[in-house]
Amino acid sequence: MEPGSDDFLPPPECPVFEPSWAEFRDPLGYIAKIRPIAEKSGICKIRPPADWQPPFAVEVDNFRFTPRIQRLNELEAQTRVKLNYLDQIAKFWEIQGSSLKIPNVERRILDLYSLSKIVVEEGGYEAICKDRRWARVAQRLNYPPGKNIGSLLRSHYERIVYPYEMYQSGANLVQCNTRPFDNEEKDKEYKPHSIPLRQSVQPSKFNSYGRRAKRLQPDPEPTEEDIEKNPELKKLQIYGAGPKMMGLGLMAKDKTLRKKDKEGPECPPTVVVKEESGGDVKVESTSPKTFLESKEELSHSPEPCTKMTMRLRRNHSNAQFIESYVCRMCSRGDEDDKLLLCDGCDDNYHIFCLLPPLPEIPKGVWRCPKCVMAECKRPPEAFGFEQATREYTLQSFGEMADSFKADYFNMPVHMVPTELVEKEFWRLVNSIEEDVTVEYGADIHSKEFGSGFPVSDNKRHLTPEEEEYATSGWNLNVMPVLEQSVLCHINADISGMKVPWLYVGMVFSAFCWHIEDHWSYSINYLHWGEPKTWYGVPSLAAEHLEEVMKKLTPELFDSQPDLLHQLVTLMNPNTLMSHGVPVVRTNQCAGEFVITFPRAYHSGFNQGYNFAEAVNFCTADWLPAGRQCIEHYRRLRRYCVFSHEELICKMAACPEKLDLNLAAAVHKEMFIMVQEERRLRKALLEKGITEAEREAFELLPDDERQCIKCKTTCFLSALACYDCPDGLVCLSHINDLCKCSSSRQYLRYRYTLDELPAMLHKLKVRAESFDTWANKVRVALEVEDGRKRSLEELRALESEARERRFPNSELLQRLKNCLSEAEACVSRALGLVSGQEAGPHRVAGLQMTLAELRAFLDQMNNLPCAMHQIGDVKGILEQVEGYQAEAREALASLPSSPGLLQSLLERGQQLGVEVPEAQQLQRQVEQARWLDEVKRTLAPAARRGTLAVMRGLLVAGASVAPSPAVDKARAELQELLTIAERWEEKAHLCLEARQKHPPATLEAIIHEAENIPVHLPNIQALKEALAKARAWIADVDEIQNGDHYPCLDDLEGLVAVGRDLPVGLEELRQLELQVLTAHSWREKASKTFLKKNSCYTLLEVLCPCADAGSDSIKRSRWMEKELGLYKSDTELLGLSAQDLRDPGSVIVAFKEGEQKEKEGILQLRRTNSAKPSPLASSATASSATSVCVCGQVPAGVGALQCDLCQDWFHGRCVSVPRLLSSPRPSPTSSPLLAWWEWDTKFLCPLCMRSRRPRLETILALLVALQRLPVRLPEGEALQCLTERAISWQGRARQALASEDVTALLGRLAELRQRLQAEPRPEEPPTYPPAPASDPLREGSGKDMPKVQGLLENGDSVTSPEKVALGEGSDLELLSSLLPQLTGPALELPEATRAPLEELMLEGDLLEVTLDENHSIWQLLQAGQPPDMERIRTLLELEKAERHGSRARGRALERRRRRKVDRGGEGDDPAREELEPKRVRSSGPEAEEAQEEEELEEETGGEGPPQTLPTTGSPSTQENQNGLEPALATSGPSAPFSTLSPQLHVPCPQQPPQQQL
């Protein structure tokens, strides 16, 4: 059995060649070079150089083609034989009214063809039955042993195959009883292929492609049973008798005789039985016309259904019908109920007269044995491919091809392995069960559709790149017409041979086993797409392949002897290899060539969508194969594509245009052809044919000069007849022309026998011209006549070979090598002579040795050409030999004078030739020079050398020839270098070590290294470092012993220098500690004064504001500080960095700065007061309008005016104060109507630059500063600020202690006590508790507090009607009280007000918090009416802030509840209550408050706890860290002490940084 498809074994790979660019330039030359290797495989693959990538020149939009349809399992020869066999056996049963059903055995379709062949091979049916060898038959069919399969096969053979075989043999059929068996598997109904009718069948649509297009449909096994009683078998009755022996079909109870009506009555009605796809059976009785229409519908219906007809039995009671029929066997008409009518010839037979007899009247169509035999013996038609009806473009074909492949393999096309496609292809072509149909755009003419290569046809302009590829020899339009190609001598454009064909393939599309026309070469180039798989067989095995295929499929070759020339037959390579045929394979990828050699069978298939181009070409070595091909065609009677004789004669007519190799090959072929022509014409004369006439055969159409016997195209001669002018024969078939007399026949010839030798002679002259030239070259190279030729004569011979285009033979190569060698000798000799003339200035490395000079002279003497430079070389050799004698004498008398040795050495260098003695002289000179250099370097008077110099001397000494003096000097030098490197390493360790050494250690190392007579860089660096350390120590002593403590900048500079020194310094550790302490103090001071992320430095905050008088400068510099662009530490007081080191200068400058700051703020107040108020309805924008920190002009409600600079700002852009110290009054808190105690004081961020700590905190910093042994600019500025604050505090206390002010304070205290004593209701209203997350909830109270106050008329405001319930009731109460507020509470005389206002101004300029400041502020507030606009603005801002706090509180509550729901731990209620307070403000002030708490922790609680109220200034919110206690009980300001936290609402505007 043949190999299965699943175990397909790929054949070995064919040779693959990768030519270099030099080899690639000559296509036919390279192919001739690889031919000895590649020809043994039949095909080969060539990969061009990577840069050779021709553009695709096809016009894609206009390219349209109609492909061929290929059914894969009809391509393979053995599969087609099986299908033909099944079609014939199916026809056999069909004409007997049965349909072929192929049974299943062991779950696979029974191979009826193989079963039939094996039965024949085993001796036939009778012999197998006799010997009981059906088990052996099952074994040969690869069925497993046991299971009684042999008996099953016998039953199927008897039922299906044996009747057909008996009919084929012409013997009478014998009765074969069916053996009953129980078969569980179902038979498959066979649908005939009708292979001969393929060309007339409409192609299937590609949208019906399926991976497994099953041809075989299951059908139940017929059995003998009463059909009428069994409804299932009644359904099966529609299939007729089935593929059984006659008499074994289904038997119905109603057996009626069919008769023919001689008188021509109307045809009986027929029953059309249709099995629909749903499984229902429909029986219709129709008229003949309707029946014909139904048959037409069946032929065009696409539905998968089965239809057949059954004739109804004629009524046997009709006497006319009975008398009309007689049996053809017994010639009787009795028993007409058992008389059968043949549907083919209308003859009648008794069912019992047939052999074998039939038990009943069969249903359906029945034909007699004579008709069955005639139908089965009909010869099959030739097989070929049919054309598709759809026309494709490249895009539409590609879409179809890719879709088919992706659907078939169920994966993307580029991911399908080539091995899988190959195995699946051979499985499909070997499969009878599966029909897979593909399309192949093959043999598309490039002349009509355009080539894939650029072509110079003047139809369009080509780019330079396209022009290069259009003229390339590898362009398939150019290769067939190259000069070395034979086809260039054929004028006609032979499509497919001279003109390329195009191939557009899809997966599984195949090209079958074939050889090229006239056994020519072929070359195929894959332009793009997926690979193409090739199989090849060498020419030596071509006949073997043909024999194997004929042996395996004789049925095909019997009807079509030239089947392999039709390109329609495949055979599995494994099958061929198993029969000894050598097969190779390859995968041709895009951009690769595949070449097939003469008479090399090849086939293959495409892996997917691709585009290829192919053409034939013929070289000189093809001519013998072409002649043999004509003889082969003559035997097969196959038409020729062109006349081989005509081609030879046309090349012989112009021998000078032929390549020499081609001329020699043509001469050889021409000679054979002339000899054969002589023989044939002589045979013609012997037959008595003497008439002849000249005929220009090349002018006749090919079909008019073809031999009517062998179809060969005639050219040299042909035999014709006067009486039969329609035909002629070649001289090989002179007896097959006609039956006419020889006297009526005549010879038609192209050349006479005298002209042919003349043409042959011209070829010989052209071919032998090479021999004449070769003899001349041979004589010259071998000096056969004893005379050497000159170079000019040899060059002339080489030029002749080039001009006459002689082949690149071995002799020509010898001539070229001789010329090349002679010219090299001449050039070398001239260089030797010119080198002597150049003397010591010649190029180094060009000298030759004495031995080389002698060999060179011998080489020149041995060359077969004469050169006059030989005499010059001999003269140089004599000079060198004389010099050698002198040198030997000088070396023998050592020690000689150094001057003598040097002069001899220079003379030898002028010769241009190296003499062995010269090297010895050179060594002696080098030794003397090196020793002198060592002495000079180590001399005591010499300057110290470096380590590099010493190493260089050692390296140079290593190359000096050894001697006692040299060895001693080298040892001393090495010892000194070792010592020096050791000390250098010590110094390096000292410089690089992490643990620095003290100066004493370094001094010891330096002192010991002074005795080494070598310059040591690390020792020198160590000296410099030690000197710097001493200078640094001196600077430290100087600065520590000065009149004042050293400045921090100086100490930092010294520390930086000291750290860089590689010396261990005790003073450095002390300085680092002092600097660290100073930095710690400055950091602590910064945390005390500076806000978080402040744009000011500590020094700027501590010093008076230098820009207080200029609003624009102050604002612009503040913006620059916000952006980090402005730094002015050294410009604060107008002092330079050096002046800042003098304490006196700092104090003087600070005093001057105080005065300038005061003058500046007064000027700024006047300027800002002149600006229009944003609250005024008539305010208009002008150049003097106030601008907020956000960069916009504040306008309308929400604007606040700074109490210091009098400028206006948005309330939402700055930190604003709270009106009340606490939203829940207590018995000890201030009365609600004491509006002068409300915290309404506002300082803008430009005026309040720091946290403004309390004076007690500053004093603690000063105490720490006194302990520092370092001077800081910030420390001195802090001292000045403290003195300024204490001075102001003293003046403020003095003013508050005056008689007038004391009286005013007393009256204000009485008013406060009166308001405090206001009686409360007995049952104050209570309010629902606020949520735990409410940011307004404070303290531990559960209910809302009592709210009390006093209206102007003394009425109580604590009634429920006057108090708003719920959250925010304090703000609503304040809002309701605003219309009732009147003032002033005190009458403040101008004499008293003016000093207080001036003090208030100076106090606001201080960056320190003082209680006296707040006392003066409350007194001034009580002395004027309440600022209703500011109070309303503050109320609105606080309401907005509380609304945001409630939203945040609700979010926190929801988050806490989600945690509880998830099973997590809830948040601490106290923490939840306090959390909203900490997030009250999202601006920088909230972060500052948190930082103050951290500062308090870091300072260790230096200030008092935050239990006592502090002043109500805006800075108190910044000072919640509680660094110092409030002076609540000292001085007259105690009654006015309250806690007034600031309020900050985030501004929706962009910050100044973003605005800028």
UniProtKB/Swiss-Prot annotation:
Q: Where do the JmjC domain residues begin and end?
A: 468-634
Q: Which InterPro entries match?
A: ARID_dom (IPR001606), ARID_dom_sf (IPR036431), JmjC_dom (IPR003347), JmjN (IPR003349), KDM5_C-hel (IPR048615), Lys_sp_deMease-like_dom (IPR013637), Zinc_finger_PHD-type_CS (IPR019786), Znf_C5HC2 (IPR004198)
Q: Which residues bind Fe cation?
A: 514, 517, 602
Which co-factor is required? Fe(2+)
The record's comment on cofactor binding reads: Binds 1 Fe(2+) ion per subunit.
Renumbered zinc finger spans (PHD-type): 324-374, 1185-1250
Q: Locate the ARID domain: which residues?
A: 79-169
The modified positions for Phosphoserine read 287, 301, 317, 893, 897, 1359
Q: Locate the coiled-coil region(s) and give their ranges.
A: none
- Name the SUPFAM superfamilies for this protein: ARID-like (SSF46774), Clavaminate synthase-like (SSF51197), FYVE/PHD zinc finger (SSF57903)
Compositional bias annotation for Basic and acidic residues = 273-283, 1335-1345, 1461-1478
Residue ranges annotated as compositionally biased, kind Polar residues, are 197-207, 1513-1522, 1530-1540
The protein's GO terms of the molecular function aspect are: DNA binding; histone H3K4me/H3K4me2/H3K4me3 demethylase activity; zinc ion binding
For bias type Basic residues, the affected ranges are 1445-1460
Q: Which residues form the signal peptide?
A: none
Which Pfam family, any one, appears in the UniProt record? KDM5_C-hel
Name of the protein in its database record: Lysine-specific demethylase 5C
The UniProt gene name for this protein comes to KDM5C
